Structures are given as structure tokens and as C-alpha cells.
Design a protein with these regions (language model features):
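Short, well-ordered beta-to-alpha junction loops that form the rim of enzyme active sites
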Residues: 39-40, 108, 159-160
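A short, gly/pro- and small-residue-rich
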Residues: 53-58, 165-175
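Conserved beta-alpha
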Residues: 70-146, 150
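Short glycine-rich, flexible loops that bind phosphorylated cofactors or substrates
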Residues: 71, 162-164
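Short amphipathic alpha-helical segments
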Residues: 48-49, 75, 117-118, 167-170
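N-terminal nucleotide/polyanion-binding subdomain common to many enzyme families
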Residues: 1-86
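Short active-site oxyanion
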Residues: 58-61, 102-104, 152-155
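Proline-aspartate-enriched helix->loop->beta-strand connector
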Residues: 147, 151-161, 168
Length: 175
């Protein structure tokens, strides 16, 4: 898999289908894998937040999300496909459902996550959501312990910050 650099961070050059295939393989193993759909705001945050920067550097798959990332790469002579995080997440939900893999959702306002779950359950056959929590929490360790108990193979995170998952968690897709 080829990676290109932008502002000191490695970004994968897979197209949408290739990213889905790669992430699906990651989801099937028992190792922790973090997938980030990177946007311009994340580069800015990484300048002042070393933990955030390290998560970006250590992610197994970094997908260019946001026209700013695509343009930045194009300016440096690298033409890559922009992969919208929401489209990628939706496809990974479909893959998980087809393979009967448990998923977790973390983030958003309480009413938004509830509506999302209702919509997904209505639209996606065989969906197995084993855990959900809104993005308003102070006890990170409690959330991590709850996730470990549920053993999801895919965790979709929609927060203004990245979460660092230890070696007991599955694929975590963050955008």
C-alpha cells in the first residue's frame, strides 16, 4: 500500500474500493487497528496536541477526507481520491452487517446518536449494534471498559477529537 506525505503525516492513496477492502481485512483480525479519515482541521489540531499527532502518525489507515487535503496533496504533485468519511463509514457499516460483525457507535449529541441508530436499524439488514454512547462523557476509562465488554469489531467514532484505543479494541474508524 502506497502512502504519501502531507505536512509531515502519511496519507494512504487507496481508492474507495481499495480502502474498504483493506479496512475489511483489518476488521477481521484480532489486532487493534485505527482508521482515520483525515481532514484539514486535524492537521491544525495536531500542531498543538502531541497525543492527537501521535494517533495520526500511528493509524493503520489514513484516508484523505476533505477537499482541503485533496488540494494540499495535489499542490505537492500527488493526485489521490478524496474519500468522504461519512460514505466510508456507511460502507463499513454495510460490510459489518453482511458479515454479522458487531459494531459500536461513539459520539454526537444524544438525540443524534439515537436517531442514527434508528435510521441504521431501519435501513441496514442484520445490523448488530452492540454499544452506543453519545459524545458527552468525562470518564474515558469507563467508555473503554464498556467497549471491551461488548467486543465490537468496528467502532465508529464521531467526536471533535480522536480516541486512542489500546490493544484490546478492534478497528476504530474516526472522522
Amino acid at each position: 500500500m502506497k502512502r504519501v506525505k502531507l505536512l509531515g503525516y502519511e496519507i494512504d492513496t487507496l481508492d474507495f474500493e481499495g480502502a474498504v477492502v483493506y479496512a475489511t481485512d483489518l476488521m477481521r483480525n484480532d489486532k487493534v487497528n485505527q482508521v482515520v479519515t483525515i481532514n484539514p482541521e486535524m492537521f491544525d489540531t495536531a500542531k498543538t496536541d502531541i497525543d492527537f499527532a501521535n494517533i495520526l502518525k500511528e493509524a493503520e489507515l489514513v484516508i484523505p477526507d476533505g477537499i482541503g487535503v485533496k488540494l494540499g496533496l495535489k499542490i505537492t504533485g500527488k493526485d489521490v481520491e478524496r474519500i468522504a468519511g461519512v460514505d466510508f463509514a456507511r460502507e463499513m457499516i454495510n460490510v459489518a452487517a453482511k458479515n454479522n460483525l458487531p459494531i459500536a457507535l461513539v459520539g454526537a449529541k444524544p438525540e443524534i446518536i439515537e436517531k442514527t441508530i434508528n435510521n441504521l436499524n431501519a435501513e441496514v439488514e442484520n445490523l448488530n449494534i452492540v454499544y452506543s454512547h453519545d459524545g458527552y462523557f468525562n470518564d474515558f476509562d469507563e467508555i473503554m471498559n464498556q467497549l471491551k465488554e461488548c467486543s465490537p469489531k468496528l467502532i465508529l467514532v464521531a467526536l471533535g477529537r480522536l480516541l486512542s484505543f489500546d490493544n484490546h479494541q478492534p478497528l476504530a474508524l474516526q472522522s
